[in-house]
Design a protein with these regions (language model features):
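Cyclophilin-like peptidyl-prolyl cis-trans isomerases
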Residues: 2-213
Length: 213
């Protein structure tokens, strides 16, 4: 079953199906012209048992073919989701993956090594979103299947790039882009509004975990 993504009119995840890119030159939009990495298997992981230190500020730095952006995790709203994202990032789960779904003016979505829209780490966590959760530009939340309970999360995430006011509060709020929102917006321009597929591969080279002391 494919993950049911947030939507304006019931949009669902689609397979990326990105073709070849180029020789790592830079395109007019400021993104590297790169080849999409080969899809790889997912699953087989267990949910982390370790809780994050809530006295610290935890961040994820995404190094992508369109630049770098930083997400500050929301441990108050989604502590289990945050711990899972940190664990997956430290394990290199997100390295050399793509944004397989890009809807201009709405969301960019990634976190699936299989590039099919079906992938996940082999487990889920649940952090019910707070009542009245607002999915505004720059908010990072977790995709789930249509039948999953509110706040269910695997590895796939989406970043709001436009008006998310119509999104029901059903998706775990992982955090907010606190640096590099222009990079997120740049990525958000590289999708086909009809198919929701990327017009060129946008690769996540690596995700680095940070925390203050």
């Amino acid at each position: 079953m494919r993950l049911a993504a947030v939507a304006l009119v019931g949009l669902v995840l689609v397979a990326a199906g990105c073709g070849g890119g180029g020789d790592s030159s830079t395109t007019a939009g400021g993104c590297e012209d790169v080849d999409a990495p080969a899809p790889r298997e997912d699953g087989g992981r267990s949910a982390p048992n370790e809780e994050l230190d809530a006295t610290k500020t935890w961040t994820l730095t995404f190094d992508t073919s369109c630049g770098t952006f930083v997400v500050t995790l929301d441990l108050d709203s989604a502590p289990k989701t945050a711990a899972s994202l940190v664990s997956l990032a430290r394990a290199g789960y997100y390295d050399d993956t793509i944004f397989h779904r890009i809807v201009p003016g709405f969301v960019i979505q990634g976190g699936d090594p299989t590039q099919s829209g079906n992938g996940g780490p082999g487990y889920t966590t649940v952090d019910p979103p707070p009542a009245g959760a607002a999915y505004t530009k720059g908010v990072v939340a977790m995709a789930k299947t249509a039948t999953d309970a509110a706040g269910t999360a695997g590895s796939q995430f989406f970043v709001i790039t436009g008006d998310g006011s119509g999104i029901a509060p059903e998706y775990a709020v992982a955090g907010t882009v606190t640096s590099g929102l222009d990079v997120v917006e740049r990525i958000g321009e590289l999708g086909d509004p009809t198919t929701e597929e990327p017009l060129q591969p946008v690769v996540i080279h690596s995700v680095t975990v940070g925390s203050d002391t």
